[in-house]
């Protein structure tokens, strides 16, 4: 092992000078350790990752934890390899940090646990699978209008507080309960409280047994937030490549991955580009996203919550992410104000899987008719606001009448929200979803009150609600 010394500390960026011509490779992990000397002192055990070579003997590194207590002249050791994290079944039901150290209260991992480096190249072309298969989520609005693809990348777009994390929790729950699939959850730069709540909720529901969790939260330095997505992805790739699993990989929130990169970029001496983001934004995003894919062995399907700064979709961070996505689920604040949950915008959400050759003719026709009804209703809203419903023709009145029922029927009660709503969650198979909307469009339920359609699963629940309201069915 080659040793060097810390020569400069700039917040989360640390320069290390090595002697006799040894220069660690880019991405190598470098350790700075110092045992605790006094009773009240805490020892230092810091991992740095090489980012740049400066001249013949100095490397500029990014710290994976706080640099408090680091001084010039401290000894630094080149480990000779990138950061490596545990993989395989030992990770299930456990919580890790960016370095793969356990941060839950359970017993330590076995000493012989397999470890893989977090930096690796994407699968080659001949390893990729070209089959398109739909992933059923049991959430009506998603399965009908913007279906997810196995091995695809799905973006969950929305501002603050419109329900991204709740939707992710429901997806983890549904995939584990209905498909028995493995999930990996990477908490990237989000609230520690949310991660804590998610862990306990998943422990209570038993879903945790099928999930590995990795966290680099808001309070951590940018190095940890920038690399924690790769730690989670490495765990997911092992389940895909070595066990042939179809893995769900959640990133909450991919914007924080970009944000962490931009925090470090200026300190690394790079010239900022548009809106102050790092000039390497597209490259960093591509290196992460290209590893998420279906191979001939298994698949990693990624669902990424994407915070949209100031609800501006042209911001470089969300705009760069768009290029990689197969489907988008857009959450709309106006729908939360109307009490429609999940607040998925049925007109703005898209999927390349919504094609007759993939979902079938009937599903495609029903989905398009639902969208055209809602689009017509949206166009009529200005007229209604100015002149009132009475000024509409009979045909338009019927469109509004049905569109409101469709809008409410797109809402659904979630398993993970039972404690807030007091209603049992529902999982709706795609066939049932298509049948329900087809019957609403045919006018079969025009006589039922709109409130009967709120927060239900199958169409039968609407009929039950109507009976409870005293309506003859």
UniProtKB/Swiss-Prot annotation:
EC class of the enzyme, as a word: translocase
Main location: membrane
Catalysed reactions, as listed in the record: ATP + H2O + 4 H(+)(in) = ADP + phosphate + 5 H(+)(out)
Gene Ontology terms, MF aspect: ATP binding; ATP hydrolysis activity; proton-transporting ATP synthase activity, rotational mechanism
The keyword Repressor is assigned to this record: no
CDD domains per the UniProt record, alphabetical: ATP-synt_F1_beta_C, ATP-synt_F1_beta_N, F1-ATPase_beta_CD
Source species, domain of life: Bacteria
Location in the cell: Cell membrane
One Pfam family it belongs to: ATP-synt_VA_C
GO CC annotation terms, alphabetical: plasma membrane; proton-transporting ATP synthase complex
Entry membrane topology: Peripheral membrane protein
Residues given in the record as ATP binding sites: 158-165
Record keywords: ATP synthesis, ATP-binding, Cell membrane, CF(1), Hydrogen ion transport, Ion transport, Membrane, Nucleotide-binding, Translocase, Transport
Enzyme Commission (EC) number: 7.1.2.2
InterPro entries for this protein: AAA+_ATPase (IPR003593), ATP-synt_VA_C (IPR055190), ATP_synth_F1_bsu (IPR005722), ATPase_a/bsu_AS (IPR020003), ATPase_alpha/beta_chains (IPR050053), ATPase_F1/V1/A1_a/bsu_N (IPR004100), ATPase_F1/V1/A1_a/bsu_N_sf (IPR036121), ATPase_F1/V1/A1_a/bsu_nucl-bd (IPR000194)
HAMAP family per the UniProt record, alphabetical: ATP_synth_beta_bact
Subunit composition and interactions: F-type ATPases have 2 components, CF(1) - the catalytic core - and CF(0) - the membrane proton channel. CF(1) has five subunits: alpha(3), beta(3), gamma(1), delta(1), epsilon(1). CF(0) has three main subunits: a(1), b(2) and c(9-12). The alpha and beta chains form an alternating ring which encloses part of the gamma chain. CF(1) is attached to CF(0) by a central stalk formed by the gamma and epsilon chains, while a peripheral stalk is formed by the delta and b chains.
Family per similarity comment: Belongs to the ATPase alpha/beta chains family.
Function: Produces ATP from ADP in the presence of a proton gradient across the membrane. The catalytic sites are hosted primarily by the beta subunits.
Protein name: ATP synthase subunit beta
């Amino acid at each position: 092992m080659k040793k060097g010394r810390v020569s400069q500390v700039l917040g989360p960026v640390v320069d290390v000078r090595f002697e006799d011509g040894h220069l660690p490779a880019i991405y190598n992990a470098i350790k700075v350790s110092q045992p605790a000397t006094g009773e009240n002192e805490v020892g230092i055990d810091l991992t740095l990752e090489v980012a740049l070579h400066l001249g013949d003997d100095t490397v500029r590194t990014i710290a994976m934890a706080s640099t408090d207590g680091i001084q010039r002249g401290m000894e630094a050791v080149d480990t000779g390899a990138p950061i490596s994290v545990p993989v395989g079944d030992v990770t299930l039901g456990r919580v890790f940090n960016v370095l793969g150290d356990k941060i839950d209260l359970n017993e330590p991992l076995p000493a012989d646990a397999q470890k893989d480096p977090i930096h690796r190249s994407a699968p080659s072309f001949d390893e990729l699978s070209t089959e398109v298969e739909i992933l059923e989520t049991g959430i009506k609005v998603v399965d009908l209008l913007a279906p997810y693809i196995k091995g695809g990348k799905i973006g969950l777009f929305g501002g603050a507080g419109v329900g991204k994390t709740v939707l992710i929790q429901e997806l983890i729950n549904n995939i584990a309960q209905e498909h028995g699939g493995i999930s990996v959850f990477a908490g990237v730069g989000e609230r520690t409280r949310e991660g804590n709540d998610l862990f306990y909720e998943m422990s209570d529901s038993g879903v945790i047994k099928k999930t590995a969790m990795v966290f680099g939260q808001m309070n951590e330095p940018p190095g940890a937030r920038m690399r924690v997505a790769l730690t989670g992805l490495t765990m997911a790739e092992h389940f895909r490549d070595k066990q042939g699993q179809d893995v769900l990989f959640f990133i909450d929130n991919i914007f924080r991955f970009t944000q962490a990169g931009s925090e470090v970029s200026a300190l690394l001496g790079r010239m900022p580009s548009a809106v102050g983001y790092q000039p390497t934004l597209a490259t960093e995003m591509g290196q992460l996203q290209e590893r998420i894919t279906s191979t001939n062995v298994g698949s990693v399907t990624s669902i990424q919550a994407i915070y949209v700064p100031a609800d501006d979709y042209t911001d470089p961070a969300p705009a760069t992410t768009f290029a990689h996505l197969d489907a988008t689920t857009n959450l709309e604040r106006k729908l939360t104000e109307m009490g429609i949950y999940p607040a998925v915008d049925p007109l703005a959400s898209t999927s390349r899987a919504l094609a007759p050759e993939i979902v079938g003719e009937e599903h495609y026709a029903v989905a398009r008719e639902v969208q055209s009804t809602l689009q017509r209703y949206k166009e009529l809203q200005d007229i209604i606001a100015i002149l009132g419903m009475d000024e509409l023709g009979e045909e338009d009145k019927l469109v509004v009448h049905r569109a409101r029922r469709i809008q409410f029927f797109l809402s659904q009660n979630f398993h993970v929200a039972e404690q807030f709503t007091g209603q049992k969650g529902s999982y709706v198979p795609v066939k049932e979803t298509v049948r329900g909307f087809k019957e609403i469009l045919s006018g079969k339920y025009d006589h039922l009150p709109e409130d009967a359609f709120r927060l239900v699963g199958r169409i039968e629940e609407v009929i039950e609600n109507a009976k409870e309201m005293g309506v003859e069915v």
